[in-house]
Amino acid sequence: MTKNNSLKLGYDYDAWHGYGQRDVLFTDISLKTNSHMILCGMSGSGKSYALVWCLKMLILASPPEAEYFFADFKQDDSFAFLRGCTFYYPYKKSLEALEVVYTILHKRQSGEDKNRYTVTLIWDEYMANILALQGEDKKKTADVMNKVSEILMLGRSLGVRFICSCQ
């Protein structure tokens, strides 16, 4: 496969239903153009499948030194193939993935880490994780949301990307 920064999102709904045309929708997934992503949909709509596809395309489009941290709050079988990986954080450990990526962001911001290869935090069922955490510890929930906000605001220029799925 060749390196390609285009990610197929699906088809233009209006073109299909209005005119019977199958117009493909793409987005550029290079860090300079599209640093963060959110995949939303109803239960059973294919968000986890789309996240696997997105991960595949990111890996194919990225340099070999790029790192991916996968927080899998739902921990169903969709990402079972990742369970043996070092950068896979299931269910209750999903917050550890955030801490690792947040530390990388701050080391880069302070100049301690001069690297700018892409570091991506992929978080499946982010909002479900936040809501579950909120029921346990509101202060920790606020801390998590602040860290995610910081990654979203500062990440692009430091080579740190956030991708999540939610309902």
Predicted regions and their residues:
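P-loop NTPase catalytic phosphate-binding loop
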Residues: 2-111, 117-120, 127-167
